[in-house]
């Protein structure tokens, strides 16, 4: 069994200036003010669009992110309906095969430490780890007895690693990040959403600056 940390990666190259320029080009059609486009007008235009709440304009730019998370977190991600998804399938992936190193991969819980010096947390982590091993054993035994992957997956845990590719427009990403960086969100989705937000704030001026993490 392999234990890894949750993470994400961009599948779209993001040029912040290009993003703003494309949004400005689309948005100025509304006002027929294309003649006001200059080399440095996009930033101010997008700032005003957000202040006015005219966020439909932000739908003219989309980008793609691949999340590496557990199955539980993936169910929260795909609830965002204004997006397109591809996800690793436990129906078709047979984790006994060599390309999976003949083992299941699970996501390390962010809320329990595998540090023996923190006794209470370590006990919880040890119980979790034991249950993951038991699930892996049961899964492989079912396969050995002729079960198909889609049948054997019924014993796989919520902590099983999955990869979810999400493509959404800027408006939906803003909505996603507002919800999933909130203190009310699940700790393990915040684990990927907060660094994603911070990276986007560095890559793209204006568009995500008003989203604050508590």
Language-model features: where?
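Family-specific signature for flavin-dependent thymidylate synthase
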Residues: 1-214
């Amino acid at each position: 069994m392999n234990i890894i940390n949750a993470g994400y990666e961009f599948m779209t190259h993001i040029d912040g200036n290009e993003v703003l320029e494309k949004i400005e080009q689309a948005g100025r059609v509304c006002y027929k003010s294309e003649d006001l486009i200059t080399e440095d007008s996009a930033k101010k235009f997008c700032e005003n669009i957000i202040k006015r709440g005219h966020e439909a304009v932000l739908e003219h730019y989309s980008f793609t992110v691949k999340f590496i998370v557990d199955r539980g977190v993936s169910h929260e991600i795909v609830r965002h309906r204004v997006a397109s998804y591809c996800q690793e399938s436990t129906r078709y992936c047979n984790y006994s095969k060599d390309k999976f190193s003949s083992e299941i991969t699970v996501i390390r819980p962010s809320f329990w430490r595998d540090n023996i010096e923190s006794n209470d947390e370590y006990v919880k982590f040890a119980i979790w780890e034991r249950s993951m091993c038991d699930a892996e054993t049961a899964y492989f035994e079912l396969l050995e007895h002729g079960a198909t992957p889609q049948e054997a997956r019924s014993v796989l845990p919520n902590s099983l690693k999955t990869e979810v590719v999400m493509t959404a427009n800027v408006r939906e990403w803003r909505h996603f990040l507002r919800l999933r960086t909130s203190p009310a969100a699940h700790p393990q989705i915040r684990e990927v959403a907060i660094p994603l937000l911070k990276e986007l704030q560095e890559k793209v001026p204006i568009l995500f600056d008003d989203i604050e993490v508590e």
